[in-house]
Amino acid sequence: LKCKNKLVPFLSKTCPEGKNLCYKMTLKKVTPKIKRG
């Protein structure tokens, strides 16, 4: 799956593979972490 890191720039900082992960799939995993942090 091709992901657009431009939509979620914070992914690059939170997830090492943010560039390869899909923003839809990553948002679900990263969002809860960002709310706590």
Swiss-Prot record:
Molecular function via GO: toxin activity
Record PTM text: May contain several disulfide bonds.
Gene Ontology cellular component annotations, sorted alphabetically: extracellular region
UniProt-listed Pfam families: Toxin_cobra-type
Keywords: Blood coagulation cascade inhibiting toxin, Disulfide bond, Hemostasis impairing toxin, Secreted, Toxin
Subunit and interaction comment: Heterotetramer composed of two A and two B chains; non-covalently linked. Does not exist as a complex in the crude venom.
Function: Hemextin A (monomer): exhibits mild anticoagulant activity. It specifically inhibits the activation of FX (F10) by the TF-FVIIa complex (extrinsic tenase complex (ETC)) by non-competitively inhibiting the enzymatic activity of FVIIa.
Full protein name: Hemextin A
Protein's organism: Hemachatus haemachatus
